[in-house]
Amino acid sequence: MKDTLKLSVVLSLYTVVACLALAFVHNFTEPIIQKVKEQKSKEALQSIFPLADAFEDILGELGNVDGNIKIQSAFVAKKEDEDIGMTIQATGPTYAHATILVGITMDKKITSIKFLELLDTPSLGSKAAEEPFIGQFNNKSIQDNFSVGDDVVAISGATITSKGVATILKTALSLIDDYMNSRGGKAE
């Protein structure tokens, strides 16, 4: 009985020390991780609109999204106080899930798409982040249906990923379209 009690106390102490160490490491690394994410996000925005000198956050002005798709950010890209485009970042289900950043011109065309995260099957679903799949969206209207088989050529063997990407794009871009329409077709 005495050995059992001693073992329980020692095990409890190890557990407490491990939890405290984990909490310390988490509190130390969390701000660093957040800074790296913010820096990567800024770099991604700048790569879509390299001429932009500022990005105005408009996430709070967008409508709500139903379903599994989450909007993380939305910005108006500006150059010398002139709107030159917009970006929206959305996450949603594919075969696993994807986070996509989309650039949009002021005449409602897609400039480029960047996958910030794509956790689908390597060599199948991961082809969504490669040409020719990703390139087919360039210069498409944001009012496109993004229907796989009609407007979007699916990746062979990764139809679920293709449909997921198309759904994420359609949902995110419909919010941008509504936003622009509510301002007379302009971003501000």
Protein language model regions, located:
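Flexible, solvent-exposed loop/hinge segments and secondary-structure transition points
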Residues: 2-188
